[in-house]
Amino acid sequence: MIKLHSNDNMAEAFMNAFWTPDSQALAPYLAAWQQAHKGLQIIAGSLQPGMTEQDCELLIRDWLRAHQLFDPARPPKVRFTAQPTRRRFGLNRPGKRRYRIGMGYILRCDAVQNGYAAKACLSGPGVVQLAALHRRLRDYHDQLPHALVRGETPQQLADRFPGLRQHYRLAPLTGTLPEGNRIGEGPLIPGLWQWQLTLSDGTHSAGSSEFLLMDDQGPRWLTDTPAHLLDTNNNGNNRKQEEAA
């Protein structure tokens, strides 16, 4: 457990309601996260011309199930992007978009193991519409720990990123969050924080859901890179944004 270097009784009361993990307690979550990314990389390397989005979703589902990571309540999602405009005929009818060499793809899944749920997303090759959003999300991801060390609040940093929305809260790794867990705009107290980000340019959006650890070693993310969840506008038709669960 982390020792609080503060005489603030309110902060101590907050900490009594939450379990603060040691260095090994997060290993199961990180293992599930690594497995999720490994699975998406394998499926991306297996894409073949003629495969539909549904075919690819079934492949991801089967891979997760074979590794005991599948949760029926969290089905994988696949989207093929940047498909050239052409007359729909036969197998190219609406709802049956098929992969062709050079198309972009967005693969999403959740790996669930022993109560730990880790999100993963993989996009490629070169989905240019999302590159700027990815870069800005990565900038925020990299700058937040340094901003917290300087004494800035998360909202002060977010104000420098137009179009960014964020939600964060103290969170245990498993179990139901108690009432009163949301914290205002004051300094973050020690603990494990769940962070959700959404960044939009009006047409496309990207988001992430990840964990920030605050302890006597300073603020730091559990993973080096953001886990992006993506939403694109395909062929001029806006799709409903898929937010982090």
Locations of regions flagged by a protein language model:
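Active-site neighborhoods and metal-handling regions in enzymes and metal-associated proteins
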Residues: 1-245
